[in-house]
Protein backbone atom coordinates (compact mmCIF):
# COMPACT_ATOMS: atom_id res chain seq x y z
CA UNK A 1 0.00 0.00 0.00
CA UNK A 2 1.06 3.57 -0.56
CA UNK A 3 1.85 5.78 2.39
CA UNK A 4 -1.15 7.13 4.24
CA UNK A 5 -1.63 10.90 4.21
CA UNK A 6 -1.19 12.51 7.64
CA UNK A 7 -4.33 14.66 7.40
CA UNK A 8 -5.61 15.86 10.77
CA UNK A 9 -9.38 16.33 10.64
CA UNK A 10 -10.88 19.49 12.10
CA UNK A 11 -12.72 18.75 15.32
CA UNK A 12 -16.47 19.13 14.97
CA UNK A 13 -19.64 18.16 16.75
CA UNK A 14 -21.65 15.06 15.80
CA UNK A 15 -25.07 15.03 14.18
CA UNK A 16 -26.94 12.28 12.36
CA UNK A 17 -28.64 12.44 8.98
CA UNK A 18 -30.83 9.38 9.23
CA UNK A 19 -28.43 6.67 10.33
CA UNK A 20 -25.37 8.41 8.87
CA UNK A 21 -23.06 10.05 11.43
CA UNK A 22 -21.71 13.45 10.43
CA UNK A 23 -18.76 15.14 12.13
CA UNK A 24 -16.65 14.26 15.17
CA UNK A 25 -14.33 12.05 13.13
CA UNK A 26 -17.05 10.13 11.27
CA UNK A 27 -16.22 9.10 7.69
CA UNK A 28 -16.76 11.98 5.30
CA UNK A 29 -20.18 11.40 3.76
CA UNK A 30 -20.59 11.63 -0.01
CA UNK A 31 -23.89 12.91 -1.29
CA UNK A 32 -25.62 13.96 -4.48
CA UNK A 33 -28.91 15.52 -5.52
CA UNK A 34 -31.62 14.26 -7.82
CA UNK A 35 -32.25 16.18 -11.03
CA UNK A 36 -35.60 14.61 -11.88
CA UNK A 37 -38.96 16.28 -11.37
CA UNK A 38 -39.73 15.38 -7.77
CA UNK A 39 -43.38 14.97 -8.70
CA UNK A 40 -42.28 12.17 -11.04
CA UNK A 41 -42.04 9.67 -8.21
CA UNK A 42 -40.94 6.70 -10.30
CA UNK A 43 -38.11 8.56 -12.03
CA UNK A 44 -36.91 10.08 -8.77
CA UNK A 45 -36.96 6.74 -6.93
CA UNK A 46 -35.06 5.08 -9.78
CA UNK A 47 -32.41 7.79 -9.70
CA UNK A 48 -32.02 7.57 -5.93
CA UNK A 49 -31.58 3.80 -6.17
CA UNK A 50 -28.93 4.30 -8.87
CA UNK A 51 -27.12 6.66 -6.50
CA UNK A 52 -27.38 4.10 -3.70
CA UNK A 53 -25.76 1.47 -5.92
CA UNK A 54 -22.63 3.57 -6.42
CA UNK A 55 -22.32 4.34 -2.72
CA UNK A 56 -24.23 7.56 -2.02
CA UNK A 57 -24.47 8.08 1.73
CA UNK A 58 -27.10 10.83 1.51
CA UNK A 59 -29.31 12.12 -1.32
CA UNK A 60 -30.84 15.60 -1.51
CA UNK A 61 -34.20 16.10 -3.19
CA UNK A 62 -35.57 19.47 -4.27
CA UNK A 63 -39.05 20.14 -2.86
CA UNK A 64 -40.24 23.36 -4.55
CA UNK A 65 -44.01 22.96 -4.12
CA UNK A 66 -46.61 21.34 -1.91
CA UNK A 67 -47.25 18.82 -4.68
CA UNK A 68 -43.56 17.94 -4.55
CA UNK A 69 -43.86 17.56 -0.77
CA UNK A 70 -46.61 15.00 -1.26
CA UNK A 71 -44.45 13.21 -3.82
CA UNK A 72 -41.55 13.27 -1.35
CA UNK A 73 -43.69 11.24 1.05
CA UNK A 74 -44.07 8.48 -1.54
CA UNK A 75 -40.41 8.62 -2.51
CA UNK A 76 -39.24 8.29 1.09
CA UNK A 77 -41.26 5.10 1.48
CA UNK A 78 -39.42 3.42 -1.41
CA UNK A 79 -35.74 4.12 -0.70
CA UNK A 80 -33.26 3.29 2.03
CA UNK A 81 -30.68 6.08 1.80
CA UNK A 82 -31.27 9.15 4.02
CA UNK A 83 -32.99 12.00 2.18
CA UNK A 84 -32.44 15.74 2.59
CA UNK A 85 -35.32 17.99 1.54
CA UNK A 86 -34.06 21.09 -0.26
CA UNK A 87 -36.33 24.01 0.68
CA UNK A 88 -36.35 27.53 -0.75
CA UNK A 89 -38.75 30.47 -0.35
CA UNK A 90 -41.67 28.72 1.36
CA UNK A 91 -41.06 27.65 4.96
CA UNK A 92 -44.40 25.83 4.98
CA UNK A 93 -42.96 23.18 2.68
CA UNK A 94 -40.32 22.43 5.32
CA UNK A 95 -43.05 21.97 7.90
CA UNK A 96 -44.91 19.62 5.56
CA UNK A 97 -41.99 17.32 4.67
CA UNK A 98 -41.10 17.13 8.36
CA UNK A 99 -44.28 15.09 8.71
CA UNK A 100 -42.97 12.58 6.16
CA UNK A 101 -39.84 11.30 7.95
CA UNK A 102 -37.38 13.59 6.18
CA UNK A 103 -33.85 12.96 7.43
CA UNK A 104 -32.56 16.54 7.11
CA UNK A 105 -33.85 19.95 6.05
CA UNK A 106 -31.72 22.19 3.89
CA UNK A 107 -32.78 25.82 4.09
CA UNK A 108 -31.26 28.85 2.41
CA UNK A 109 -31.11 31.82 4.80
CA UNK A 110 -31.15 34.22 1.87
CA UNK A 111 -34.66 33.33 0.80
CA UNK A 112 -36.49 31.32 3.46
CA UNK A 113 -38.05 34.36 5.12
CA UNK A 114 -37.94 36.29 8.38
CA UNK A 115 -36.74 35.07 11.76
CA UNK A 116 -40.21 34.03 12.85
CA UNK A 117 -40.47 31.65 9.91
CA UNK A 118 -37.04 30.23 10.67
CA UNK A 119 -38.11 29.76 14.29
CA UNK A 120 -41.13 27.76 13.18
CA UNK A 121 -38.94 25.49 11.06
CA UNK A 122 -36.45 25.05 13.91
CA UNK A 123 -39.15 24.26 16.45
CA UNK A 124 -40.56 21.63 14.12
CA UNK A 125 -37.10 20.15 13.49
CA UNK A 126 -36.42 19.98 17.23
CA UNK A 127 -39.72 18.26 17.95
CA UNK A 128 -39.07 15.62 15.29
CA UNK A 129 -35.30 15.31 15.85
CA UNK A 130 -34.47 16.47 12.33
CA UNK A 131 -31.10 18.14 11.65
CA UNK A 132 -30.84 21.25 9.49
CA UNK A 133 -28.28 22.36 6.95
CA UNK A 134 -27.79 26.09 6.69
CA UNK A 135 -26.95 26.44 3.02
CA UNK A 136 -25.34 29.78 2.20
CA UNK A 137 -24.72 30.35 -1.51
CA UNK A 138 -22.83 33.17 -3.20
CA UNK A 139 -25.60 33.44 -5.78
CA UNK A 140 -28.39 34.08 -3.29
CA UNK A 141 -27.00 36.22 -0.48
CA UNK A 142 -29.38 38.39 1.51
CA UNK A 143 -30.03 41.78 -0.11
CA UNK A 144 -28.49 43.77 2.71
CA UNK A 145 -25.26 41.78 2.41
CA UNK A 146 -25.22 42.27 -1.35
CA UNK A 147 -25.51 46.02 -0.77
CA UNK A 148 -22.92 46.03 2.01
CA UNK A 149 -20.20 44.12 0.16
CA UNK A 150 -21.11 44.93 -3.46
CA UNK A 151 -20.36 41.38 -4.56
CA UNK A 152 -19.97 37.96 -2.98
CA UNK A 153 -16.85 37.89 -0.82
CA UNK A 154 -15.61 35.42 1.79
CA UNK A 155 -16.58 37.90 4.49
CA UNK A 156 -20.09 38.23 3.04
CA UNK A 157 -20.62 34.47 2.98
CA UNK A 158 -19.23 34.19 6.50
CA UNK A 159 -21.49 36.96 7.79
CA UNK A 160 -24.53 35.31 6.24
CA UNK A 161 -23.65 31.97 7.78
CA UNK A 162 -22.87 33.39 11.22
CA UNK A 163 -26.07 35.43 11.23
CA UNK A 164 -28.08 32.23 11.02
CA UNK A 165 -25.79 30.17 13.22
CA UNK A 166 -26.32 32.80 15.92
CA UNK A 167 -30.07 32.60 15.35
CA UNK A 168 -30.06 28.83 15.84
CA UNK A 169 -27.90 29.28 18.93
CA UNK A 170 -30.45 31.68 20.39
CA UNK A 171 -33.10 29.04 19.76
CA UNK A 172 -30.93 26.45 21.55
CA UNK A 173 -30.76 24.29 18.44
CA UNK A 174 -27.42 22.61 17.77
CA UNK A 175 -28.32 19.81 15.36
CA UNK A 176 -27.12 21.50 12.21
CA UNK A 177 -24.36 21.64 9.66
CA UNK A 178 -23.33 24.58 7.49
CA UNK A 179 -22.18 25.18 3.93
CA UNK A 180 -20.86 28.34 2.25
CA UNK A 181 -20.78 27.47 -1.43
CA UNK A 182 -19.61 29.47 -4.42
CA UNK A 183 -18.89 28.65 -8.05
CA UNK A 184 -15.49 30.34 -7.77
CA UNK A 185 -12.95 27.98 -6.23
CA UNK A 186 -10.98 30.61 -4.32
CA UNK A 187 -14.11 32.30 -2.99
CA UNK A 188 -15.49 29.01 -1.72
CA UNK A 189 -12.21 27.82 -0.21
CA UNK A 190 -11.54 31.04 1.68
CA UNK A 191 -15.15 31.21 2.90
CA UNK A 192 -14.89 27.70 4.35
CA UNK A 193 -11.54 28.48 5.94
CA UNK A 194 -13.01 31.51 7.71
CA UNK A 195 -16.09 29.59 8.81
CA UNK A 196 -14.05 26.65 10.12
CA UNK A 197 -12.33 29.02 12.55
CA UNK A 198 -15.62 30.41 13.85
CA UNK A 199 -17.76 27.36 14.62
CA UNK A 200 -17.40 23.71 15.54
CA UNK A 201 -20.48 22.43 13.73
CA UNK A 202 -19.98 19.98 10.85
CA UNK A 203 -19.29 21.56 7.46
CA UNK A 204 -20.80 20.38 4.19
CA UNK A 205 -18.41 21.09 1.31
CA UNK A 206 -19.19 21.95 -2.27
CA UNK A 207 -18.18 24.08 -5.22
CA UNK A 208 -21.63 25.04 -6.45
CA UNK A 209 -22.55 25.12 -10.14
CA UNK A 210 -19.07 23.84 -10.91
CA UNK A 211 -19.81 23.04 -14.56
CA UNK A 212 -19.98 20.00 -16.81
CA UNK A 213 -18.63 16.55 -16.09
CA UNK A 214 -15.00 17.36 -16.91
CA UNK A 215 -14.61 21.00 -15.87
CA UNK A 216 -16.82 20.55 -12.82
CA UNK A 217 -14.83 17.56 -11.64
CA UNK A 218 -11.60 19.55 -11.99
CA UNK A 219 -12.94 22.56 -10.07
CA UNK A 220 -14.34 20.34 -7.34
CA UNK A 221 -11.16 18.30 -7.05
CA UNK A 222 -9.11 21.47 -6.61
CA UNK A 223 -11.47 23.25 -4.22
CA UNK A 224 -12.55 20.29 -2.14
CA UNK A 225 -9.07 18.82 -2.26
CA UNK A 226 -7.58 21.98 -0.78
CA UNK A 227 -10.08 22.02 2.07
CA UNK A 228 -9.97 18.30 2.77
CA UNK A 229 -6.17 18.33 2.82
CA UNK A 230 -6.42 20.95 5.57
CA UNK A 231 -8.79 18.72 7.55
CA UNK A 232 -11.87 20.82 6.75
CA UNK A 233 -15.10 19.08 5.79
CA UNK A 234 -17.50 16.47 7.12
CA UNK A 235 -19.74 15.87 4.09
CA UNK A 236 -19.34 16.78 0.44
CA UNK A 237 -21.13 17.05 -2.84
CA UNK A 238 -19.52 17.36 -6.23
CA UNK A 239 -21.94 19.53 -8.23
CA UNK A 240 -21.90 18.58 -11.91
CA UNK A 241 -24.11 19.40 -14.86
CA UNK A 242 -24.17 15.66 -15.55
CA UNK A 243 -25.69 12.41 -14.36
CA UNK A 244 -25.78 12.60 -10.53
CA UNK A 245 -24.19 9.14 -10.42
CA UNK A 246 -21.01 10.79 -11.70
CA UNK A 247 -21.06 13.15 -8.70
CA UNK A 248 -20.78 10.20 -6.33
CA UNK A 249 -18.00 8.59 -8.35
CA UNK A 250 -15.97 11.80 -8.47
CA UNK A 251 -16.60 12.42 -4.77
CA UNK A 252 -15.18 9.05 -3.82
CA UNK A 253 -12.29 9.53 -6.27
CA UNK A 254 -11.36 12.75 -4.46
CA UNK A 255 -11.46 11.03 -1.07
CA UNK A 256 -9.50 8.05 -2.40
CA UNK A 257 -6.86 10.34 -3.90
CA UNK A 258 -6.32 11.96 -0.51
CA UNK A 259 -6.51 8.55 1.24
CA UNK A 260 -9.24 9.88 3.51
CA UNK A 261 -11.86 7.28 2.67
CA UNK A 262 -11.51 4.21 0.51
CA UNK A 263 -14.30 2.60 -1.47
CA UNK A 264 -13.68 0.32 -4.39
CA UNK A 265 -10.65 0.12 -6.61
CA UNK A 266 -8.05 2.84 -6.86
CA UNK A 267 -6.59 2.35 -10.34
CA UNK A 268 -3.02 3.49 -10.93
CA UNK A 269 -2.34 3.55 -14.67
CA UNK A 270 0.31 5.03 -16.92
CA UNK A 271 -0.66 7.47 -19.70
CA UNK A 272 1.10 5.10 -22.17
CA UNK A 273 3.84 5.62 -24.72
CA UNK A 274 5.45 3.52 -27.46
CA UNK A 275 6.95 1.22 -24.81
CA UNK A 276 3.57 -0.19 -23.75
CA UNK A 277 3.30 -3.93 -24.30
CA UNK A 278 -0.52 -4.12 -24.11
CA UNK A 279 -3.49 -1.78 -24.46
CA UNK A 280 -3.33 -0.01 -21.10
CA UNK A 281 -6.01 2.59 -21.82
CA UNK A 282 -8.50 0.05 -23.14
CA UNK A 283 -7.80 -2.25 -20.20
CA UNK A 284 -8.33 0.45 -17.58
CA UNK A 285 -11.50 1.78 -19.20
CA UNK A 286 -12.99 -1.70 -19.47
CA UNK A 287 -12.10 -2.69 -15.92
CA UNK A 288 -13.46 0.53 -14.44
CA UNK A 289 -16.84 -0.28 -15.99
CA UNK A 290 -16.80 -4.01 -15.27
CA UNK A 291 -15.74 -3.65 -11.65
CA UNK A 292 -18.03 -0.84 -10.49
CA UNK A 293 -19.74 -3.32 -8.19
CA UNK A 294 -16.54 -3.97 -6.22
CA UNK A 295 -16.54 -1.87 -3.04
CA UNK A 296 -13.52 -3.56 -1.44
CA UNK A 297 -10.73 -0.96 -1.08
CA UNK A 298 -7.66 -1.94 -3.06
CA UNK A 299 -4.95 -0.39 -5.21
CA UNK A 300 -4.52 -1.88 -8.69
CA UNK A 301 -1.62 -0.66 -10.82
CA UNK A 302 -1.73 -1.20 -14.58
CA UNK A 303 1.55 -0.14 -16.16
CA UNK A 304 2.46 -0.86 -19.77
CA UNK A 305 6.19 -1.49 -19.43
CA UNK A 306 9.00 -2.27 -16.99
CA UNK A 307 10.16 1.32 -16.44
CA UNK A 308 7.77 2.14 -13.59
CA UNK A 309 5.68 -1.02 -13.50
CA UNK A 310 7.63 -3.02 -10.91
CA UNK A 311 7.91 -0.07 -8.54
CA UNK A 312 4.18 0.64 -8.64
CA UNK A 313 3.38 -3.06 -8.28
CA UNK A 314 5.43 -3.27 -5.09
CA UNK A 315 3.03 -0.92 -3.32
CA UNK A 316 -0.22 -2.14 -4.91
CA UNK A 317 -2.68 -4.81 -3.88
CA UNK A 318 -2.44 -6.14 -7.43
CA UNK A 319 -0.14 -4.85 -10.15
CA UNK A 320 0.54 -5.59 -13.80
CA UNK A 321 3.84 -4.74 -15.47
CA UNK A 322 3.91 -4.91 -19.26
CA UNK A 323 6.16 -7.49 -20.89
CA UNK A 324 6.66 -9.03 -24.33
CA UNK A 325 3.53 -11.12 -25.08
CA UNK A 326 3.03 -11.77 -21.38
CA UNK A 327 2.95 -9.29 -18.50
CA UNK A 328 3.98 -9.80 -14.91
CA UNK A 329 1.26 -10.00 -12.25
CA UNK A 330 2.16 -8.92 -8.73
CA UNK A 331 0.11 -9.53 -5.59
CA UNK A 332 0.92 -7.56 -2.45
CA UNK A 333 4.27 -6.64 -3.96
CA UNK A 334 5.30 -10.19 -4.89
CA UNK A 335 5.48 -11.41 -8.48
CA UNK A 336 3.02 -14.30 -8.79
CA UNK A 337 2.24 -15.03 -12.42
CA UNK A 338 2.29 -13.90 -16.05
CA UNK A 339 -0.81 -12.86 -17.96
CA UNK A 340 -1.36 -13.12 -21.71
CA UNK A 341 -1.39 -9.63 -23.19
CA UNK A 342 -4.07 -10.63 -25.71
CA UNK A 343 -6.51 -11.60 -22.95
CA UNK A 344 -5.53 -9.05 -20.34
CA UNK A 345 -8.96 -7.65 -19.47
CA UNK A 346 -10.69 -10.95 -18.69
CA UNK A 347 -7.71 -12.38 -16.81
CA UNK A 348 -7.20 -9.28 -14.70
CA UNK A 349 -10.90 -8.94 -13.93
CA UNK A 350 -10.91 -12.52 -12.64
CA UNK A 351 -7.84 -11.92 -10.46
CA UNK A 352 -9.22 -8.69 -9.04
CA UNK A 353 -12.55 -10.27 -8.14
CA UNK A 354 -10.80 -13.19 -6.47
CA UNK A 355 -8.59 -10.83 -4.47
CA UNK A 356 -11.60 -8.75 -3.42
CA UNK A 357 -13.35 -11.88 -2.15
CA UNK A 358 -10.21 -12.90 -0.26
CA UNK A 359 -9.91 -9.49 1.39
CA UNK A 360 -13.60 -9.43 2.27
CA UNK A 361 -13.35 -12.83 3.92
CA UNK A 362 -10.26 -11.80 5.88
CA UNK A 363 -12.07 -8.71 7.16
CA UNK A 364 -15.12 -10.81 8.08
CA UNK A 365 -12.93 -13.15 10.13
CA UNK A 366 -11.24 -10.19 11.83
CA UNK A 367 -14.63 -8.77 12.80
CA UNK A 368 -15.77 -12.12 14.21
CA UNK A 369 -12.60 -12.41 16.27
CA UNK A 370 -13.08 -8.91 17.68
CA UNK A 371 -16.70 -9.68 18.54
CA UNK A 372 -15.64 -12.85 20.39
Curated annotation (Swiss-Prot):
It comes from the Bacteria. Its cofactor is [4Fe-4S] cluster. Its EC number is 1.17.7.3. One of its GO terms (biological process) is terpenoid biosynthetic process. Pathway: Isoprenoid biosynthesis; isopentenyl diphosphate biosynthesis via DXP pathway; isopentenyl diphosphate from 1-deoxy-D-xylulose 5-phosphate: step 5/6. One of its GO terms (molecular function) is 4-hydroxy-3-methylbut-2-enyl-diphosphate synthase activity (flavodoxin). [4Fe-4S] cluster binds at residues 270, 273, 305, 312. Keywords: 4Fe-4S, Iron, Iron-sulfur, Isoprene biosynthesis, Metal-binding, Oxidoreductase. Pfam families: GcpE. InterPro entries: Dihydropteroate_synth-like_sf, IspG_bac, IspG_bac-typ, NO2/SO3_Rdtase_4Fe4S_sf. Binds 1 [4Fe-4S] cluster. The keyword 4Fe-4S applies. Belongs to the IspG family. This is 4-hydroxy-3-methylbut-2-en-1-yl diphosphate synthase (flavodoxin).
Amino acid sequence: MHNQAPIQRRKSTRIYVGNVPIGDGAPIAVQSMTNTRTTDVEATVNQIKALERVGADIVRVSVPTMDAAEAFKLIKQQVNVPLVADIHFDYRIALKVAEYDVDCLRINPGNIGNEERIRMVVDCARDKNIPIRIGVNAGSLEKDLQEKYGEPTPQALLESAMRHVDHLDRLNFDQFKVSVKASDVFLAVESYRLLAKQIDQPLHLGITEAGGARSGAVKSAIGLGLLLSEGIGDTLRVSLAADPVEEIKVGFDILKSLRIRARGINFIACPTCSRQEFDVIGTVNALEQRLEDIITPMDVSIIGCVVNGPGEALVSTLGVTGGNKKSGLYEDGVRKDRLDNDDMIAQLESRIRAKASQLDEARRIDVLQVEK
